[in-house]
């Protein structure tokens, strides 16, 4: 049986949005990652602050593997090193967003106005047996 996987829309290209898109794409899901500004803009706003946890706790094994597959010479931070928010963005989040798994599905400078579910033409067409999302 070859069922088509549902398309996943992720709102926000911050750390969680990028990692979520990465895992979904790795599993074969079609993904669109929307960001109203720049990648990890909120982290960049407090980029001067040192993170409370080391890099190893702020990255995933899939993220590290994706970066190494993309560029074997990419210098990853020491897993025990603590960095500023800005360093986290420039050394991990931006390169990850530029990787083959994310780059094609990322849409920056796009503000999401509304979301919904397929098959709902109007409020009266809601089938109570269907899950809401």
PLM region descriptions:
Residues 24, 46-49, 121-123:
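Short, glycine/charged-enriched secondary-structure capping and boundary segments
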Residues 4-33:
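N-terminal Rossmann-like FAD-binding beta1-loop-alpha1 element of flavoenzymes
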Residues 17, 40, 52, 115, ...:
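Flexible, glycine-rich phosphate/dinucleotide-binding loops
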Residues 75-133:
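Feature captures the FAD/FMN-dependent oxidoreductase FAD-binding
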Residues 38-91:
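Glycine-rich active-site loop/strand segments that organize a redox cofactor
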Residues 32-35, 106-108:
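A structural signal for short, well-ordered beta-strand segments and their strand-loop junctions
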